[in-house]
Amino acid sequence: FFKQKTAYEISTRDWSSDVCSSDLARCLVHRYPKAHASLLFVFSLCLGANSLPELLYAQHTPPEVVADQIRWVRIPSGKFMMGSPVPPSQLAMDFKEYEREGSYFQDEYPQHVVEITKPFFISPTEVTVGQFRLFVEETGYRTEAEVDGFGGWGFDPKEKKCVGRDPRFTWRDAGYLQTDLFPVVNVSWADCQAYCKWLSTKEKRIVRLPTEAEWEYCNRANIYLHYNVGNTSQSVLEGARTRKPTKESIRQAVQNLEIDPDDSTSFPQRVGLYAPNAFGLYDMHGNVWEWTNDWYDADYYKYSPLKDPQGPVQGYVKIRRGGGWNSFPLWARSSFRNWNTAESRCVNLGFRVVAELSSWEIEEYNKQQPIRLNFVGDIMLDNGPGNAIMNGIDPFANVASWLLDSDATIGNLECVLGREGEMILKPYNYLGAKNSDQFLKRYFTALSLANNHAYDFGPEGLMGTVNILKQNGIGSFGAGEDINSARHGLLLNVRGRKVALLGYNHFRMEDYEATETKPGCASLKTEWVIEDIKRVKKDWNAEIVIPFLHWGREMQDAPLDIQRIEAKQWIDAGATAVIGGHPHVVQTVDSYRGAPIIYSLGNFVFDYYPVDPLVWIGWGVRLTIPPSGPVEWE
């Protein structure tokens, strides 16, 4: 496995093809879709949070960069957690040598879910001097530093530090050795816009600066540490062009730091000298800061939209990201937010560009890609998990990156969210904590309600739960206002492919069964499942059909013989996979005609049976479903 090509070994010819992130560690390129990323996940756990496999950041040959062509990297759509993975107080502790209060980091918080809904192209490197020169030669463009005559910033060897604004310094000369392969600097935000407009004409597509969300999504490539190269300052000092702080220098402004003119490591480098991240992008930390398209607002994360945030509609300063060659590691972190006035031109500030795909390209791209569906087991947000939510703690936080790293995530909700109704008489009743919906909507596309706890507060509680989920954009299935709605199922459009989810309950099903006049669950009857599979394939033209069952015996590690028989019958009827839960433990798995049968996922978020170690193990299952061929799963 480790001998296969990793992302940093992609040839320039590969850059124009899909450089997709693999599961969890996201380290392999698109050409190796069957690589077992779970191995890297285990490997990363063994290494601990402070390091990543050295393989990813080994020596490599810098990429070929030419002035007359951007070799785009295609970035897939997806969800990620934006912002600092730890709260401001912890950041202050992690970087205590900088003597910063927690409030200094407040604009990186709260960490929140962002969905990038469309794939896009991004330049693998920062725009180079040579690439910018071609733009100037073809258009006669003059930068703001040249037009206003004030110049930019640059290195003065006599003073041994950077000075500015100074007419001596523009994008053509920053005072240090600078070839056509170096990142262009001393360009204002307006200069970047002019370059994008010119390149849009040449590329025959919209070219622009990345949004702040797109930039962090690309930087992280699903790595939720301080840096995409590790979690310590040393990791970014070794994996990017940044400056090592000292007790003396850490208290000085960057522009006042003395620089040795004979030390080439004190300045920017040619692009791509360090290994890329898992998306195949170079210098996302250090080298030069990078302009983004967004205005800055310190409180923006508090009201930022979930999908494709564009930043505030107006502001006074523009956001820049990533840190520069003279930045200390604190400011090169993946989540660090910095800003400049739009007319700024700096010796450590450049840019990279994004190109939008047409609607036709997105449609064709989606047709060629597999879709990935995550399934998890029992979710109960009362008791311990409920207390956590009441205290503002996210019970899903430790697996957030895995939950988000899919096209859709589905679970089994074993509690009531609605406040209507009365508690029915039974041994265990679960009422999800207030605000549970705010955490569920971060991660879940759909939830099955076909279980014995959906009815804990009677029909009013059940329908209240259905309505709350609907209000939060979460689909539900397996229960409803009558038997028709309970059996109806849920149709998802997952990147242009139709996925039908069907839910059924077997445990004491007579007590919770929906009828023609009463809300409840869809009971697990083999003939109903077969009928419903055939119905959704015919009426909805569903390509993918997955029954999600609440069945089996509790605390048993193997299914009943009848379950094995029924699962095969449903696959014969057209089911793509069969997924189950309820026993509170994981069970044997089967495969039939290439379709996986997961009899029980066990608990996911649940503190029932706290003294029994068997229930401490739960599975998350990912189905990878290509346009044609068998389903892959892990």
Language model features by range: what are they?
Residues 41-43, 52-164, 168-169, 189-190, ...:
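Short, compositionally biased
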Residues 284, 355, 492-495:
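Active-site beta-strand termini and strand-to-loop segments that position acidic
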Residues 362-634:
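Acidic, metal/ion-coordinating pockets
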